[in-house]
Regions:
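Conserved GNAT acetyl-CoA-binding A-motif
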Residues: 97-114
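Short amphipathic alpha-helix that is part of the acyltransferase structural core
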Residues: 1-29, 155-166
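Conserved active-site alpha-helix within GNAT-family acetyltransferase domains
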Residues: 109-132
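Short strand-connecting beta-turns/loops that link adjacent beta-strands
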Residues: 9-10, 50-53, 63-66, 138
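Active-site rim helix/loop that mediates acceptor-substrate recognition in acyltransferases
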Residues: 20-50
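Conserved acetyl-CoA-binding loop-helix of GNAT-fold acetyltransferases
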Residues: 76, 82-95
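C-terminal "cap" of GNAT-fold acetyltransferases
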Residues: 116, 136-172
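Conserved beta-strand in the GNAT
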Residues: 46, 53-62, 68-75
Length: 172
């Protein structure tokens, strides 16, 4: 059985090398941007088993005022992949954000890569749906999925900008 613990800045520094391993440079934020996001309301979620051993991480961007979130980066550690741990983590995240209007997930390089197609199928089996709106990250085609009440197409850009704002908003 797993549970989610909220991580802090020391945890972010510790897991960032894993983030570098799990995600391409063009699709992951810098360590400084991750820390800035934590200061401004993003959440680092750590998946822990009953003995306290860490099994994975997720970095969530949020617009808490409007109740939107983005599951930006999620990974289960390689030594325990393939045993349903990712599905359990996703279910815990769904429960944690159940009161949010909508939670988004981006699947990069979709439908180009087989890995991206499998990942999209995994998220769809857990209740996420395609927005049907063309979307790109770093010039690469990206599938935008949602769970909950998705905003109208005309409002989507503003919603996503607000969700990303804690990490990429104005820096003073």
């Amino acid at each position: 059985m797993y549970e989610i613990k909220r991580g802090g800045h020391a945890d972010m520094k510790r897991i960032y090398p894993m983030l570098e391993h799990d995600f391409h440079e063009w699709e992951r934020p810098s360590l400084a941007d991750c820390h800035l996001g934590l200061i401004r309301g993003a959440e680092l979620l750590l998946l822990k088993d009953e003995s306290g051993l860490e099994a994975g991480y997720a970095y969530m961007l949020r617009d808490a005022a409007r109740r939107y979130a983005l599951l930006g980066w999620l990974a289960v550690y390689p030594t325990i992949r393939g045993a349903g741990t990712g599905a359990q983590f996703l279910e815990l995240i769904k429960a944690r954000y159940a009161r949010y209007e909508c939670v988004f997930i981006e699947v990069t390089e979709y439908p180009e890569l087989e890995k991206a197609r499998r990942l999209a199928g995994f998220y769809k089996r857990h209740g996420w749906c395609e927005t049907g709106i063309p979307y790109a990250i770093g010039g690469r085609e990206t599938l935008l999925l949602h769970r909950g009440e998705a905003p109208q197409r005309a409002d989507l850009r503003g919603v996503l900008e607000a969700v990303y704002a804690p990490m990429y908003g104005p820096k003073f």
